[in-house]
Amino acid sequence: MNQEITNDEARERYEDIAHELAATHSDVELRKLFSMPAIYVKGKACAGFTQGKEMVFKLTGAAHAEALGLEGAHLFDPGGMDRPMKEWVVVPAAHAAEWPRLAELALAYVAGR
């Protein structure tokens, strides 16, 4: 379901997801990636929150294709130099309802679960 939310609401949703993952997975840490808040598992980044109202997820296979198929989603290009990180998908806040599930999928992928 698409819905418009504010920057503060988007950040709060990211924080809820990040803290829930950290509370339920002992190998999850909350750190920075490219100056943005990020979720790490086993020392590797799996998701983050951009300066805008977007979350980024490291995904593969069907999960990657599904996320990339969401309206407004695109590959993550942190430097804006047309060199996207191919496994990373930016998902706008209009799809914030999908963020928790995508975060779990990203965590599982990066952790090798």
Q: Language-model segments: what does each one mean?
A:
Residues 1-113:
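Charge-dense, helix-prone N-terminal extensions
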